[in-house]
Amino acid sequence: MNKIYNNLSIENLIKTDWFEQFKLYQKEEILEGLKDNLDVSIYANPEYKWSQMSEIRKGLQDNLNVSIYAKTYFNRAQMKEIRLGLKNNLNVSVYATARFNEYQMKEIREGLENNENISIYLKSRFNEYQIIEIKKGLKKKLNVSVYANKKLSGYKMREIRKGLENNVDVSIYAKPYFNKKQMREIRCGLEDNLDVSIYAKSDVYWKQMEQIRLKLLKEKNQ
């Protein structure tokens, strides 16, 4: 924002050609900032969407170091997660990077707020679904290293986490080559103390696994 325009009154500013380059909602964000005596030059940039401007303006209202997230490559939701982290005095540097989407940022921010060992899910660039499962395991003090594997989807991680919660030998099915439904059938069999070795094979379709498991369970209960 040109210093000449910065010194104009709001009434005169809205009459300038400079102000006319902005769209309606962008103009509203600039005017809101001026009314609150904020340094709108930080976000008075036509490259910002109005929603991005709004997040920067909110940060300025709270006297936050908005320079950390006042970047055009962060979308509104990413900016919000960084702003909330700054507001709570968190070390946002660990997630204030474009390589994390807003959902990943949210999970990392909440992990910092809860004093979790976020290093476990930061180093391998897990997606938000994987991070959620790792966080659930950490919260229950499980050995998450068993399933904190980038090759395992969030759904597969969930099956392994449930097995750990029920104290079964998850090593039998904690393999990337089993799909989530196969893992579920093996886990359910282990929880019922069945001999899952009969069907715990990657070439056995999950529906076949289910049929074998139910047959074994029926025989056991006779």
Question: What label would you give each PLM region?
Answer:
Residues M1-Q222:
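General marker for long, soluble alpha-helical cores
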